[in-house]
């Protein structure tokens, strides 16, 4: 979790130096320390020109990568974000700067000429959040914050199963210091994982000004807000011959030049030139979705992410979507959170599996869930193996730890 004030100051100064050219590229450690990475700006060493930061991730699949971010990309991201959310001002750092969401808070603060506040090191709780907001500057105008869904759940719905031990139940009438603190922000960016409808509804009922963001390290963080690409960003669907489903491709000035010292993966995911702009850099994601509208057309584009390429499950010769199964489960009464995936199976090829976090003991009905999935998605989508858990395991960035969950299911039959 975020850093102490002294480390935050050093982190921002290190990134500012990289951005203005007086210092080398940086990578942030989990404790907020700035690690100097001069080789990241050297193409001969596996880097790229103009690189100012490196974001190291392993992702939910466990495959490590080092994403290179350039001065131009971070600047474009900061400017487009300010234009979309309606202003620049002071940010609260609630996500570590070793994640792209935290690094983006620093780069946006540098662009705005402000100093971010930060949570103290330690577990993220409603109390620590409210205390951090109290330390923010008064009367500075625009305030912004970036959270992952797990954090917002702990603030809005602290009694939800598996989310926190801060309170005995949901905040009555959405009161309390943490929710009052959330209301002081002009913009709350929520991304990094899907946001359940229950959480979106709770945020709306509490009167919070949230923006659901979509993006990744390769796009300097969120580049699509509330389903609409930021200025300069375009989206299109590209057929993926391996999976047989279309993949989302994002293009714009905030796209990374690639991965450090990984030319094969860089070639597979990055390129230059789209139908709308022959000079635009693009990134081919691992996500599936829909895109409505054309770049520059009235109303612009709207994008919806429906799942991941590796979420497509081929079971008994039929293709089903793990993301669609998860959405059905999370729409059911008594279900707080859910996960759907697959494991190898000698008979079916891939066996559909599901894990469910119930709202309360005995609140989940497997029979009702089976019937709902069968009615809405068809018999092949009905999970053949179920787990009921107290909480979904999470990676440090708040995303569901897919590998942990899949390892819990029975080995191939």
Regions found by a protein language model. Give the residues of each.
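Conserved pre-ATP/AMP-binding loop-to-beta segment of ANL
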Residues: 6-9, 38-56, 89-90
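AMP-binding/adenylate-forming catalytic core of the ANL superfamily
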Residues: 252, 279-281, 288-381
